[in-house]
A protein has these predicted regions:
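N-terminal targeting/secretion presequences
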Residues: 2-7, 30-31, 35-49, 55, ...
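Generic N-terminal simple sequence motifs
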Residues: 6-10, 29, 34, 211, ...
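Gram-negative bacterial Sec-dependent N-terminal signal peptides
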Residues: 2-28
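N-terminal amphipathic/hydrophobic interface segments
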Residues: 30-165, 182-185, 189-201, 260, ...
């Protein structure tokens, strides 16, 4: 039976409820028959039924020994628990003063509050307002997995606390062992509502060595952005030497922020990188300005400017993309600061468009300004023709389909056909930037019209699409052509018929049930010959010869060139799809073009008299979950040799394990092999280790390209990663080709403190951009592993 309590004054109702629950649980245990499972009371960190909004939660105290005086105090000893809303307090002894709402707890005191846990020897706490003092506690924050210790923690309210002589880390606690990294501070303040921490007199230690000291250091308690200094950026390359920069992040408003990074390069001098981002109701964008005044190596100031903006007004949308740099060698010396995929050709592009859907079709109106900066350099052999600028481009495009009344009257072969058509009218003013080569033809004006009418027929397993299209253009040039003309025009009609089928059957492949398809396709094209040698070429370029382009009616992109094709493309694709998973397991394809007459308007300007084009073959396989492979081959049947080929294979047996190999060949141009990987090489992965240690595992990651033709490495990156669970170290070497005999070699070092920040150059981005299937080692851990704006 429960031990009788001393005779005291009547206790408050919550205390009596706790005592009654204790006695009821013990009585049930005594009365339960031996053959039945006894009912048990189980502890919980929160009350099962939360208080209603506006209601004050009940305060419940339970203990092995409990005494109470009504409306004055309650004293407990031996496994004491105090529950109040989201608060659960455990201690060896507890003295609760009712009037003051003050709890004094001693001996193995443990607080659980909103998922956070605090443990220490002595606590004084005003319960309802969660205000008090905890002596020499340790703590754990549930939102981030971070933990620490302090001499004293002052609870200001339920969302704010201040720790004297405190520490913070995301490494798991190990008895008698310092964490691999931690922040120690004279005073540590935490705003749990805003998810941010502030360390005054802070020192960041890594493996016991101080690596950063600051009068004040802010850090995140979640993935939300906040103002403050970020860990430094560290770079080392052969052109600029050692670079050290310290970013400051300014969280201006929820929809605006900025980052300023003063830096120093040992070879070049001092500079400043800046970025401003905004997200407004009508528009969003980013502005980057990078400055290097008085470059000691180059002899002049260097800069770059990047503008990105998207927005709209009414039915109209606009898009701005612009990148400019100070000089032709900027892309070599400051490659990290150039974003363009073509670093020697920088665009400034402003597009304005309107999309309007009507009952009979769609009208697209648009206007564009496009200018270029070409970084030619002094090497004449590496210089290239500059694309023409559009100043401006204005057009309208109408797309429509005939209504049902028209369709009912048009029934070839007894089937209803769907008439559709489009018309594009456009004006362009073309000119050349100042960096254009002297031999390039000057600009001019062009008006063109592109139109087509088609009558698609088909069913579930076939289609037949006859199509008539017209490409008409008129020119007014700034300088006369070779024949003396400045004004000229031409009209190019084209007839095409696209016909295909889809046949399916049940099949088996390597013992697996499959659904196999056979998809033959024919494309007939007839475009008459028009002499285009004396016409300007402002925007046309040859299309790559592949499975997509062979099924088009023009071998050129743009408007100015139209190939005089009279040809039939014949091909077929077969697919095997798993009936169980619905995934494509195998795909095989072949296609070839047959010419009915010689072709004179060609990509290389040489007439084509060969009746059969090169044969294109393609295959892709995913026969097993861990393996992927694909390849394409362009084969010349007349010479019996391959013209181009690409072979690729990838093996990914599990997380953080990927290996890919590629071979690329273009006859008389290039032959290259590529190896990319991410692979564990030593140690036990974090997911398989005990959580009581930060023991590590080594990984290797990288991509290496080797030119068999030139017998040298081209653009490559290779390095190692060490994952200790609560921190990740990455270091590697990146090699970029910047000319026929020039390279830029960069050493990268990055320390990622999981739950805090990344220290060093962004090796992570380099690996993600270069390694197919790369996965960040800490991706399954703290939500704020990257404290980067």
């Amino acid at each position: 039976m429960p031990r009788p309590l001393p005779h005291l004054r009547p206790a408050p109702l919550p205390t009596l409820i706790a005592l009654a629950l204790c006695a009821w649980g013990q009585a049930l245990a005594l009365q339960s028959p031996a053959d039945e499972t006894p009912l048990q009371l189980r502890g919980s960190r929160v009350l099962g039924a939360p208080a209603k909004a506006g209601d004050k939660p009940a305060l419940v105290i339970s203990a092995g020994k409990l005494s109470a005086q009504a409306d004055q105090k309650a004293e407990g000893a031996g496994g004491v628990e105090l529950r109040y809303g989201e608060l659960l307090l455990r201690a060896d002894t507890l003295d609760y003063r009712v009037v003051e709402d003050l709890a004094n707890a001693e001996g193995k005191v443990n607080i659980s509050h909103k998922g956070n846990v605090f443990t220490g020897p002595a606590l004084q706490l005003y319960v309802s307002r969660f205000e008090g003092e905890f002596l020499t506690p340790s703590f754990f924050l549930g939102a981030t997995g971070g933990s620490g210790k302090a001499k004293v923690i002052d609870f200001i309210d339920s969302d704010h606390l201040s720790a004297t002589e405190g520490t913070y880390t995301s490494c798991p606690a190990v008895d008698n062992q310092e964490p691999d990294w931690q922040i120690s501070a004279r005073r540590l303040r935490m705003d749990l509502a805003a998810n941010e921490g502030q360390a005054d007199g802070a020192v960041l230690r890594f493996l016991g060595v101080p690596i950063l000291a600051a009068p004040s250091l802010s850090f995140p308690l979640s993935s939300e952005r906040k103002s403050g200094w970020l860990p430094p950026n560290i770079f080392l390359d052969n052109r600029s030497g050692f670079e050290f920069g310290v970013p400051y992040y300014w969280n201006i408003a929820p929809q605006r922020d900025a980052t300023f990074t003063p830096f120093v390069m040992t070879k070049r001098g001092l500079g400043l990188d800046s970025e401003f981002r905004y997200l407004e109701p009508g528009h969003a964008g980013r502005i980057n300005v990078d400055l290097l005044p008085g470059d000691r190596v180059f002899g002049h100031s260097r800069w770059s400017l990047k503008l990105n903006n998207d927005g709209g007004f009414g039915d109209w949308r606009y898009r701005l993309r612009s990148e400019r740099v100070s000089d032709d060698d900027y892309w070599k010396d400051m490659s990290r600061r150039v974003e363009s995929q073509t670093p020697r050709l920088l665009a400034s592009d402003l597009n304005v468009s309107r999309h309007k859907e009507l009952s009979w079709g769609v009208i697209d109106s648009y206007a564009r300004l496009q200018h270029w900066q070409t970084l030619q350099g002094k090497d004449a052999l590496s210089q290239f023709d500059t694309p023409y600028q559009r100043s401006p481009q204005i057009g309208v495009r109408v797309t429509t389909a005939a209504d049902e009344a028209v369709l009912d009257s048009f029934r070839p072969w007894g089937r209803k056909a769907r008439l559709e058509g489009s018309l594009e009218l456009e004006y362009n003013r073309f000119d050349l930037p100042g960096s254009a080569l002297a031999g390039q033809a000057r600009g001019g004006q062009r008006v063109h019209a592109l139109g087509h009418v088609a009558a698609p027929l088909g069913g579930e397993a076939w289609w037949f699409i006859p199509r008539v299209s017209v490409n008409a253009a008129a020119y007014d040039l700034d300088h006369a052509q070779a024949d003396g003309r400045m004004r000229m025009s031409r009209v190019m009609p084209t007839l095409s018929i696209d016909h295909g089928w889809v046949f399916e059957r049940d099949a088996t492949l390597f013992g697996r049930d499959m659904r196999q398809s056979l998809e033959p396709r024919l494309l007939y094209v007839n475009t008459p010959l028009r002499d285009q040698a004396n016409l300007p070429n402002f925007d046309s370029a040859p299309k790559d010869f592949n499975f997509d382009s062979i099924y088009t009616d023009n071998q050129f992109s743009g408007v100015d060139r139209v190939s005089d094709l009279h040809a039939l493309s014949v091909g077929a694709t077969s697919r095997w799809v798993s009936t169980a998973e619905g995934e494509e397991v195998l795909r095989l394809g072949a296609v070839q073009r047959f010419l009915f007459r010689d072709q004179f308007v060609t990509p290389d300007g040489q007439p084509v008299t060969q009746r059969f084009s090169d044969l294109l073959l393609a295959a892709a396989a995913h026969l097993e979950e861990r393996w992927w492979a694909d390849g394409t081959l362009e084969f010349n049947p007349e010479s019996g040799r391959s013209v181009r080929s690409v072979l690729r294979a990838r093996y990914a047996p599990g997380p953080f394990k990927t290996l890919s190999v590629a071979y690329r060949y273009a006859r008389a141009q290039s032959e290259q092999i590529e190896l990319a990987w991410q692979w564990p090489i030593y140690g036990q992965p974090v997911a398989q280790r005990s959580q009581t240690s930060c023991g590590g595992a080594w990984y290797s990651a990288g991509r290496v390209q080797y030119s068999l033709r030139d017998k040298r490495l081209t653009d490559s990156v290779a390095g190692f990663e060490y994952d200790a669970g609560c921190w990740v170290m990455r270091f590697g070497l990146e090699r970029l080709s910047t000319g026929r005999a020039e390279t830029n070699t960069r050493l990268m070092l990055q320390l990622e403190l999981v739950g805090l920040s990344q220290l060093g150059s962004n090796a992570l981005k380099v690996l993600k951009d270069n390694v197919p299937g790369y996965r960040r080692l800490s991706s399954d851990r703290s939500p704020s592993s990257d404290f980067l704006p």
